[in-house]
Amino acid sequence: MTNERHDELACLGIFPLKNPKQLDGVVTPILQLRVKFLAPTDRWWEGLVINKDLSKEESEELWKFLQSFDPRSAKFVGRGTPEDHVISYLFEAGKYEFEVFFYQKDHSLKLMGLYDKTQKQLLRRDSSGDLTSTDKERDVSPVSHSEKPYWDRYDLDQPSNQDVEESRNLVQEPKHRSKKYDRLGLDELVMEQTASLWKICSRNGMSVDEFLRFIRMGLESNFQHSNQVIPTHF
């Protein structure tokens, strides 16, 4: 391994992973938010995987992997420039890919997150034009359907044009609407909007603590006229 490659792997020195405190200061703010607030408290490590919601078995498998993962075994697979003054490095280990961000302005390295490689392959295959729609449904479903963005899933659940034409009335509730899809879709929507908002705030010098404080203030103002109570510890 070259010295340059060793430097790129520096923030992976947090592994093997034993507790969430090891993530302090070495992950991106968005990943920190995912681990602290989006993942279940007793399965916080699930927040590290950003392209898939894990089953109980997959969560246990990931935890065992993270506890024994040696970053020196990671294989470098590529780099990119997701935004100005940021270089992205991608490493592969086991069934996961690790993305590391190098911020050129302050020369800091942050772990962006993990990707489930199998899920990436399914999504890539689903979006390619090599297969017919019938082949896609047979080979990829139902996983591809559950991983589609919220609004795409919503459209798939709507009545067909023929149904609408025959009844002349829109169906108020989709026939096959799943509460699970709705929840996951809203999770994605909140995460996407939060990420965009944080990017703007961080570029203007706002810290993570300030960002979270303003989010809390926004929630409190919304709860003023509600019988719901906002948690005391956000």
Swiss-Prot record:
GO cellular component: cytosol
Location of the protein in the cell: Cytoplasm
Keyword field contains Phosphoprotein: yes
Residue(s) carrying Phosphoserine: 127-128, 141
UniProt KW keywords: Cytoplasm, Meiosis, Phosphoprotein
Modified residues (Phosphothreonine): 132
UniProt record, GO biological process: meiotic cell cycle
Region (Disordered): 126-176
Composition skew (Basic and acidic residues), residue ranges: 126-156
Role, per record: Has a role in meiosis.
Protein name: Meiotically up-regulated gene 35 protein
Gene name as annotated: mug35
